[in-house]
Amino acid sequence: MKKMRKQTGFTLLEVMVVVVILGILASFVVPNLLGNKEKADQQKAVTDIVALENALDMYKLDNSVYPTTDQGLEALVTKPTNPEPRNYREGGYIKRLPKDPWGNDYQYLSPGDKGTIDVFTLGADGQEGGEGTGADIGNWNIQDFQ
């Protein structure tokens, strides 16, 4: 006697229904994830700017002045010359300069246009001004991005 085996598995129709349902779910989830990426990039910029500002404050505590605009943020990593700081810490104030979340260098002005010093990123567009992801984020407006 031959036994008949029952075949198990999914029909093509069942697989197609699952694919359609997954597509519908993805249409709701993906836009939310993209918005979170933009927010995460802005939060990283805020965190970096606060850390750079703290390192600059430590530099000023040791040397009585902030680095000049020409010396830039690089003065936090390697000892600047002309003018040479009086009490520069061995090893610097940070190990390396971070890039902003969009791969650009952070900007630094001393004296600043918005305060004693300005530390900022030009945002995703790399241009002054802008809105949304292209907005400039600086130590003068970080509260707007928290």
From Swiss-Prot:
Q: Name where it's found.
A: Cell inner membrane
Highest rank taxon of the organism: Bacteria
Which residues are removed as the propeptide when the protein matures? 1-9
* Induction record: By cyclic di-GMP and VpsR.
Tell me which residues bear N-methylphenylalanine. 10
Give the transmembrane region(s): 10-30
Q: What is the effect of changing residue 121 to L?
A: Complete loss of secretion
* Keyword Transport applies: yes
- Bilayer topology: Single-pass membrane protein
Q: How is it modified after translation?
A: Cleaved by the prepilin peptidase.
Carries keyword Aminoacyl-tRNA synthetase?
A: no
* Record keywords: Cell inner membrane, Cell membrane, Membrane, Methylation, Protein transport, Transmembrane, Transmembrane helix, Transport
InterPro entries for the chain: Bac_GSPG_pilin (IPR000983), N_methyl_site (IPR012902), Pilin-like (IPR045584), T2SS_protein-GspG_C (IPR013545), T4P/T2SS_Core (IPR050470), Type2_sec_GspG (IPR010054)
* GO biological process entries: protein secretion by the type II secretion system
Give the primary localization class.
Answer: membrane
The record's disulfide annotation reads none
Which is a Pfam family this sequence falls into?
A: T2SSG
Q: Which PANTHER family match?
A: GENERAL SECRETION PATHWAY PROTEIN G, TYPE II SECRETION SYSTEM CORE PROTEIN G
Family to which the UniProt record says this protein belongs: Belongs to the GSP G family.
Task: Tell me the subunit arrangement.
Answer: Type II secretion system is composed of four main components: the outer membrane complex, the inner membrane complex, the cytoplasmic secretion ATPase and the periplasm-spanning pseudopilus. Forms homomultimers. Interacts with EspL.
Q: What does this protein do?
A: Core component of the type II secretion system required for the energy-dependent secretion of extracellular factors such as proteases and toxins from the periplasm. Pseudopilin (pilin-like) protein that polymerizes to form the pseudopilus. Further polymerization triggers pseudopilus growth.
Q: What is this protein called?
A: Type II secretion system core protein G
The organism is Vibrio cholerae serotype O1 (strain ATCC 39315 / El Tor Inaba N16961)
What's the name of its gene?
epsG
